[in-house]
Amino acid sequence: GGGVAGTSCAYHLAKYGWKNVVLLERDQLTSGTTWHAAGLIGQLGATSTITKLRKYSLDLYKELEKTTGLSTGLKQNGAITVASSKDRMQELLRQATTAQLSNVEVEVLNKARIKELYSVLKNDDLVGGVYMPKDGQADPVGVTNVLAKAAKMLGVQIFEKSPVKKILVKNKRICGVETSQGKIDCEYVVLATGMWSRQIG
């Protein structure tokens, strides 16, 4: 699939030494669900692994803009997450501590600071919140195009208008894929086809 997931997989496989990586897209890059995504980039996660992955993604987008000369449309305008209960605030504090351990910039907020940062927000029933100044948004199409170009720079071949008709199996192992353009022999397949996955048998 030629969305953000597929291009990211292709880029990272090539980056970490995999050879002969091929990305097949049924239509054009970003023509699936990626095109509809909001592109929000928040670093605060429920676990340290998710937080690290989100920070990595943000840093990667900035790095690949320089590498490829293309824009992801990244705007780091910050994000506030608020809590209206003590339990929710405790969860935000836990996540904020985890984020700080991963070198993510985060500020714990009281009601007054929330009002200062976002004056139109009614804060009467709030306990507090957290502010992530480096969070923001990017253009999902831009991110995909940046990842695709970076992948190509590492030797990945990308074929658009090449829908996969079926995954070929021999002796209970994947041995290739059949596309509209012909057969490709391979040992491994990464399915990044979103809601079209069921069509591949």
Positions of the model-derived regions?
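Glycine-rich Rossmann-fold phosphate-binding loop(s) that bind the pyrophosphate
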Residues: G1-G3, R26, T193
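N-terminal Rossmann-fold NAD(P) dinucleotide-binding loop
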Residues: G6-T7
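Gly/Ala-rich phosphate-binding loop of Rossmann-like dinucleotide-binding domains
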Residues: A10, A14, A150
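Glycine-rich FAD pyrophosphate-binding loop
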Residues: A14-W35
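Short loop/edge segments at beta-strand edges and connector loops
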Residues: E25, N110, E160-S162
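Dinucleotide-binding Rossmann-like beta1-alpha1 core, especially the glycine-rich loop
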Residues: A38-L117
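A short, glycine/Asx- and small/polar-enriched loop/turn
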Residues: D87-Q90, Y118-L126, L168-C175, I184
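Helical element adjacent to the flavin cofactor pocket in flavoenzyme catalytic cores
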Residues: V130-Y188, A192-Q199
